[in-house]
Every structure is written in C-alpha cells, then in structure tokens.
Amino acid sequence: MLVLSRRADESIVIQPADGVDESMTLAQLFANGPILITLLGGTGRRVKMGIKAPEQLAIRRKDVV
C-alpha cells in the first residue's frame, strides 16, 4: 500500500506504469483487482490516504509528474 498525504486542491495521478503495453485493455489492466483508496486520517487541510492498485498502474503526486 502506498501512503500519501495531500492538502486541499492537491492531486494524485493514476496512469499505466512505465513499460506497460499501451494496447492493454482496461480488463487486462485490472485483471489483478481494482484500485482501493483508504482514507487513513486527516488534520486541518491535510488528509492521509493509502492506495492499493494493480502493479500495471503507477500512482504519483501530480506535482511530481
């Protein structure tokens, strides 16, 4: 599980991971299960979330992309 903290108006990007065949269908991308996002807590304007996703998907902070 990847754990990220985000503030109001900050984003995450979920996209095919580097090296994944671009011709893969959605069914193939999600063959190992769905994306699961769990809110783990928050303080003020910040929330901590845990994200589980198939290895074919990359999860990145938008400010890093």
Please identify what each model-predicted range represents.
Residues 1-65:
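Compact, glycine-rich, soluble single-domain proteins
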